[in-house]
């Protein structure tokens, strides 16, 4: 059986869709955000199911049926992501933020440029990186620049102002508000 660290090791070997030009001077570290790709989330669900079933054999069938049901939702979500990418106008996405969607982008065939290649300690982005992102947005006529749901939008707003791109939030599926939690919002809805 795979465990989370084995999944992480295997997935980090796949690093084909990173746009090195935006962050050439930064070293790329592993990304612990496995859950951002539905295919990885399925593996995590199966690990949880197996562990729970191992420790609570009486309810193994219950855990199995719940995992199967949730994995069907994850498969549908994965399908919808792939459809959007297949029918989209571009495969390049710009993030004026820390990038935590490596596994999702690798899975669905998107390429990214970001102010930071991974979730590093927040600091002002490098000028050459910002200039590069602005150039890519203009050259490719990208209408949107993304930021994460919990990050202040300062960098994104500055780049948007210079390029005319709109700022949108890309939810990384690990933060919910109290209201969302009380309403039962989960990974699938985010």
Where does each model-flagged region fall?
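Extracytoplasmic metal-acquisition and chelation regions
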Residues: 1-190
């Amino acid at each position: 059986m795979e465990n989370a660290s084995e999944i992480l090791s295997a997935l980090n070997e796949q690093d084909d869709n990173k746009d090195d030009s935006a962050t050439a001077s930064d070293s790329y570290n592993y990304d612990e955000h496995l859950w951002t790709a539905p295919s990885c989330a399925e593996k995590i669900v199966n690990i949880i199911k197996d562990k729970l079933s191992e420790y609570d054999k009486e309810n193994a069938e219950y855990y199995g049926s719940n995992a199967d049901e949730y994995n069907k939702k994850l498969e549908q979500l994965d399908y919808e992501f792939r459809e959007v990418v297949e029918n989209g106008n571009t495969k390049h996405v710009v993030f004026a933020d820390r990038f935590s969607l490596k596994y999702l982008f690798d899975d669905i065939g998107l390429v990214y440029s970001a102010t930071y290649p991974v979730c590093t300690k927040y600091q002002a982005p490098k000028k050459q990186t910002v200039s590069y992102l602005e150039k890519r947005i203009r050259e490719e006529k990208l209408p949107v620049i993304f930021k994460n749901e919990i990050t202040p939008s300062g960098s994104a707003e500055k780049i948007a102002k210079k390029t005319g791109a709109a700022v949108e939030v890309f939810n990384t599926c690990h933060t919910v508000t109290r209201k969302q939690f009380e309403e039962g919002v989960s990974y699938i809805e985010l």
